[in-house]
Swiss-Prot record:
It is a multi-pass membrane protein. This is Potassium-transporting ATPase potassium-binding subunit. Pfam families: KdpA (PF03814). Belongs to the KdpA family. InterPro entries: KdpA. The lineage of its organism: Bacteria, Pseudomonadati, Pseudomonadota, Gammaproteobacteria, Pseudomonadales. It comes from Pseudomonas aeruginosa (strain ATCC 15692 / DSM 22644 / CIP 104116 / JCM 14847 / LMG 12228 / 1C / PRS 101 / PAO1). GO terms for biological process: potassium ion transmembrane transport. The gene is kdpA.
């Protein structure tokens, strides 16, 4: 690594960690309806939204009502987006006269964006009109991120409140998260991207003649606005087919830095938001420390793996540097691996290099990030509520080891909460191992892999892991656009999203109804280095050990076949 690459990584951490505490406090004020920096310009618009949709901002909901409102909203969004994609050919802002999508692809895409996954079995510039990109996908990018924020806030209230059945109002939380948090940040990032050269236009595609005399079509469109929310909302779906490797999505080193840092900006800030809810920022620092430890470990190992020469070519009389296949030469290895680890540590899925071309170990680390449940920062809201599940599991295990009733911040964890926690541990294995095994065992679906041997298995494993983890990145050699995979990966995305949300809201409701006992000297501290170590080990063992056999059949076997 040279000095420029080291400076890039340091700048990345600075852009994320310096504003995170301030943004976290701002998010707390917003979600609790306190006066904040943008109250003056946005509060009147917020009140208009409530009047327009008949919402009483003073009323609150219990966990069941909150859950029903969330499910109804997501179902309506799914039906609306599916209809837009099917009827695309008859809708406006379609200068290329693109037809509607085939129904299984439309279903897969609608589920993908509603669940904040943004798995793309299509190429945006060749398949979707401007209307579908803006009114369909971009809207869901905003609201799916806001839904994740709502679930996190409900869980934080459940942990911090006492002897109540109320978790807040879903419609109020959704409005505030979108209006005060996502829209202002996306406006700022979109302007920065336009400054760097990302297109934001309704003009038709440009037809040009190259120097060799060949005809070329240059796609345009309102890209900057969608790219801003796809990064900040941890959505990840690209306006163009090759995502942020495309020079129109990511034209410069500055745009690359802005985009990769924005992936985990809000997830990092929400760690501090949680600290404000429980009135103990030490909890935030402990959770953030665990996240950073796992993140830096993955980044360091991936950089080491990608800077190694290919062992299969070691006997040849050639000088090898870091392999550059699948990487943008304008960014290089360090920027590519920083993005790969960041996009899979969060549930983002955007890419600035092709993960299918990484070394076996370099490709395994993004895969492992997803298998851990996207808790290393994770998605907007989704990452922290996933991490809090592991916090509760770690507290439960600590209670078993010392023979005490486990409790977290004064709230006792009883049989009901533990059963729900165990249920969430089964979500990823069902999506990855069960659905993936069905796909691998049938000859038709298995033909979607384009490589023989362990790497072909890794392609299929990555696809179903990405869908179940609501990430959306891919080993792009996998032929995903078939009716079977469209439906099965769509099912995996639904399981991965709502299989977590439903038990989390139930846990939040149960904890909110409990009384909190004062934290005393006999309580297990959840803010020191000992707990950070216990939490890290819990994530690696409980979250990662489940998938070790599948990793052995895929990337580990591929690495051993090349020579270590």
């Amino acid at each position: 690594m040279n000095s420029h690459e080291i400076l890039l990584i340091l700048a990345f951490f600075a852009l994320v960690l310096v504003p995170a505490p301030f943004l976290g406090r701002y998010c707390f004020k917003v979600m609790e309806g306190q006066r904040n920096l943008l109250s003056a310009p946005l509060a009147p618009l917020e009140r208009v939204c409530y009047r327009l949709f008949g919402v009483d901002p003073a009323s609150e909901q219990d966990w069941k009502t909150y859950t029903l409102a969330l499910l109804a909203f997501n179902l309506a969004g799914l039906v609306l987006l599916f209809s837009i994609l099917m009827l695309q050919g008859s809708l406006p802002l379609n200068p290329q006269h693109l037809p509607g999508l085939e129904w299984t692809l439309a279903f897969n895409t609608a589920v993908s964006f509603v669940t904040n996954t943004n798995w793309q079995a299509y190429s945006g510039e060749a398949s979707l009109s401007y209307f579908s990109q803006m009114v369909g996908l971009t809207v869901q990018n905003f609201v799916s991120a806001a839904v994740g924020l709502c679930v996190l806030v409900a869980l934080a209230r459940g942990i911090s409140r006492r002897s109540t059945r109320q978790l807040g109002n879903f419609w109020v939380d959704l409005t505030r998260g979108t209006l005060y948090v996502l829209l202002p940040l996306c406006l700022l990032l979109a302007l920065l991207l336009v400054w760097q050269g990302v297109p934001q236009t309704f003009f038709d595609y440009v037809h040009a003649t190259t120097l060799q005399g060949a005809e070329q079509t240059i796609p345009l469109g309102p890209a900057a606005s969608q790219i801003a929310i796809k990064q900040l909302g941890t959505n990840g779906g690209g306006f163009f087919g090759v995502n942020s490797t495309h020079p129109f999505e990511n034209p410069s080193a500055w745009s690359n830095l802005f985009e990769v840092a924005s992936i985990i900006l809000i997830p990092a800030a929400l760690v501090f938001t949680f600290g404000h809810y429980v009135k103990d920022l030490r909890q935030s620092r402990a959770i953030l420390g665990c996240m950073l430890l796992l993140f830096c470990l993955g980044l360091g190992l991936s950089l080491w793996a990608e800077y190694q020469p290919n062992p299969a070519l070691a006997q040849l009389p050639i000088e090898q540097g870091a392999p550059m296949e699948g990487k943008e030469s304008r960014f290089g290895t360090a920027a590519s691996m920083l993005w790969a680890i960041t996009t899979t540590a969060a549930s983002n899925g955007s890419v600035n290099a092709m993960h299918d071309s990484l070394s076996p170990l370099g490709g395994m680390l993004p895969l492992l990030n997803m298998m851990l449940g996207e808790v290393i920062f994770g998605g907007v809201g989704a990452g922290l509520y996933g991490m809090l599940l592991f916090v509760l599991i770690a507290v439960f295990l600590a209670g078993l080891m010392v023979g005490r009733t486990p409790e977290y911040l004064g709230k006792k964890l009883e049989a009901k909460e533990v059963r729900l926690l165990v249920f969430t541990l089964l979500v990823m294995p069902v999506g990855v191992l069960v659905l993936g095994a069905i796909a691998a065992s049938l000859p038709g679906p298995a033909s979607a892999v384009t490589n023989p041997g362990p790497h072909g298995f890794s392609q299929l494993l990555y696809a179903y892991t990405s869908g179940s983890a609501n990430n959306g990145s891919a080993f792009a050699g996998f032929g995903a656009n078939t009716p079977f995979h469209n439906l099965m990966i769509g099912l995996a995305m639904l399981i991965g999203r709502f299989g977590y949300i439903l038990p989390i809201l139930a846990i939040a409701g149960s904890l909110a109804a409990k009384k909190a006992s004062p934290v005393g000297p006999n309580s297990f501290p959840t803010h020191g280095p000992l707990f950070v170590s216990l939490l890290t080990v819990t994530i690696l063992l409980v979250g990662g050990l489940t998938f070790l056999p599948t990793l052995a059949l895929g990337p580990i076997a591929e690495q051993l076949s090349l020579g270590f």
